[in-house]
Amino acid sequence: EQQIRLSEIPAPEFGEAERARALAAIFEAAGLKVRTDETGNVIGESLGSQPGVILFVAHLDTVFPAGTDVTVKRDGNHLIGPGISDNAAGLAALASLARALSESRVKTKKTIALAGDVGEEGEGNLRGIRALVDGYGSRLANVIAVDGPSIDYITTQGIASRRFEVTITGPGGHSWSDFGEPNPITAMARGIVKFSAIRIPANPRSSFNFGVIEGGTSVNSIPARASVKVDLRSEDESELARLEKALRDAMMAGVNEELRSSRSPDAGDDYTQLNQFHMQMEFLPIGSRPAGKLPNDSPLLATIRSVDSYLGNRARLERSSTDANIPLSLGIPAVAVGGGGRGGGSHTLEEWYDPAARDQGLKRLYLVALALAGLDR
């Protein structure tokens, strides 16, 4: 029920405050020392007797815009609703961990910090975890990002990503009387097609996504502006740089091709006459996530493996783009794991969650927390 309540509090990008307040109340009820930092992260601490902090973090935000119906529906054992798995499952796991620490009255050597952070999704650019890592500084021993439900993976490698907003502007005009003037939407379409045709290597694994396109004012107006938001990802920073250059070149080629094909409205049947107007392109970075990798012989990974062995859980090593990217890029041991249960349809309106075997995930987090923090006898 707590997961449903959290999921039904809207938390779009840059709009996580109400959900943060709800999580803070849960932490306070569990007896944690609670604060909210300037970035909007809510932090609850179970204080240790010695220096060092073990940070468990789950992101508060979702990919869904303000106004999305976030009501959770039931279908048998399934809970269905935007964000119910990503990341209400992670937040509910933190809430359960807070209660377990309180009810067990356990004392640890290192401080166990639980944080609901902002800005993990979309254009948040991991601003929440950046602030947490900066705030704890050298005290930070380990970071465990709790992202989604599944416990059959351990994310030990952070995929690098760069995100851009490409904007093309032109003179605009009437679809009939100004026909032939360069069209920013057409120029953008040309560029997208050109970039989509480039070679994307299987190794290092890389990807791209044109996620949001905007432009135009009416069906009978030549638009004066068009923009697209693009996500580039790769396991390798040099390949990511190659993709960025290829994107710039393709979009500019689309602009130049559109200019060459345009003509003056007064040119009659002379379609070879170039338009004297010009177009401009702006290439704006809107996000950058660094890569990082946890060594296979890391004590953090060994601890999780030991707990998994005790619980009879088998988990594969994975790579992804999560809150763990930031500490990994700085050499701080970090992983991303699930909070328990099963889920699917992430980032869609039909996202679902099944609490089957959820207890296994919660036990896993609790035992990992105690093993890393150390019992204070």
Model-derived features with residue positions:
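Acidic/histidine-rich catalytic neighborhood of metal-dependent amide-processing enzymes
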Residues: 78, 83, 87-159, 201, ...
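A non-catalytic alpha/beta surface segment that caps or lines the substrate-entry region
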Residues: 2-5, 9-52
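Catalytic-core environment of secreted peptidases
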Residues: 45-87
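Short beta-strand segments
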Residues: 57-58, 115-117, 143-147, 167-169, ...
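Metal-dependent amide/peptide-bond hydrolase catalytic core
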Residues: 3, 8, 184-377
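Acidic-glycine-rich active-site phosphate/pyrophosphate-binding loop
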Residues: 60-75, 140, 155-167, 306
